[in-house]
């Protein structure tokens, strides 16, 4: 891990590493530091946002399944607020190299596979910073929101905040099978994608 006072000119990029497992943070931060990255660590999404407030990183690598604010929520917030930051999502709960549905990231790293793949991904996504891609990122990311209970008729619902007019409205949850839900703002009719936060996500 980068030590205070080390020469900044040798750093390839400043990276924020987010995971709730201390062993993962230690192993990956050492790997990334040895390969020229300046690394800061956070143990969940809330701590990651605090680190971003201190200094915006060049890259983010985040676990998905974490207590507090999950990686699903964190990456959705990052994609909307800081769409120019390249992001790699990682998890042991999904296999293969395809992004899991609803994950706002540029690449996916499966935990436990060759860490050299992660280094290759970091090299690749640093070339994605174009204004056209930034616009596409911001438009495609779903909002991750918790359920708010049940209406008088017993139907589960969520409170959705429109990113265009910033007004809030209730939305009854239908029986769709996919992870991403679609609706239009009741006020300005802006199309909105959202996904549901489950409080009992496995660590």
Q: Which residues make up each language-model segment?
A:
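Receiver (REC) domain active-site loop signature in two-component systems and cognate sites
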Residues: 66
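Hydrophobic/aromatic residues positioned on beta-strands within the core alpha/beta folds
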Residues: 88-90
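Alpha4 helix (beta4-alpha4-beta5 surface) of REC/receiver domains from two-component response regulators
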Residues: 73, 92-120, 130, 134
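C-terminal output/effector regions of signal-responsive regulators
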Residues: 139-203
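Two-component/phosphorelay signaling modules centered on CheY-like receiver
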Residues: 22-40
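Active-site residues of response regulator receiver
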Residues: 19, 63
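Active-site beta3 strand of CheY-like receiver
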Residues: 55-61
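Acidic catalytic/metal-coordinating carboxylates
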Residues: 43-47, 70-73
């Amino acid at each position: 891990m980068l030590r205070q006072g080390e020469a900044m000119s040798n750093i390839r990029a400043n990276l924020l590493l987010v995971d709730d497992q201390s062993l993962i943070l230690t192993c990956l931060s050492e790997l990334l530091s040895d390969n020229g990255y300046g690394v800061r660590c956070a143990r969940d999404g809330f701590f990651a946002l605090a680190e971003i407030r201190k200094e915006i990183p060049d890259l983010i690598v985040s676990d998905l399944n974490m207590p507090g604010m999950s990686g699903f929520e964190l990456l959705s917030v990052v994609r909307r607020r800081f769409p120019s930051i390249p992001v790699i999502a990682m998890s042991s709960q999904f296999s293969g190299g395809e992004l899991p549905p609803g994950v706002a990231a540029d690449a996916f790293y499966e935990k436990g596979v060759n860490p050299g793949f992660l280094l290759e991904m970091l090299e690749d996504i640093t070339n994605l910073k174009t204004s056209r891609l930034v616009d596409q990122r911001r438009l495609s990311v779903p909002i991750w929101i918790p359920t708010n209970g049940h209406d008088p008729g017993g139907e589960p619902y969520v409170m959705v905040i429109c990113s265009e007019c910033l007004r809030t409205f209730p939305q009854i949850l239908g029986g769709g099978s996919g992870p991403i839900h679609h609706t239009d703002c009741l006020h300005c009719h802006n199309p909105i994608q959202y996904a549901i936060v489950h409080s009992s996500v496995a660590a």
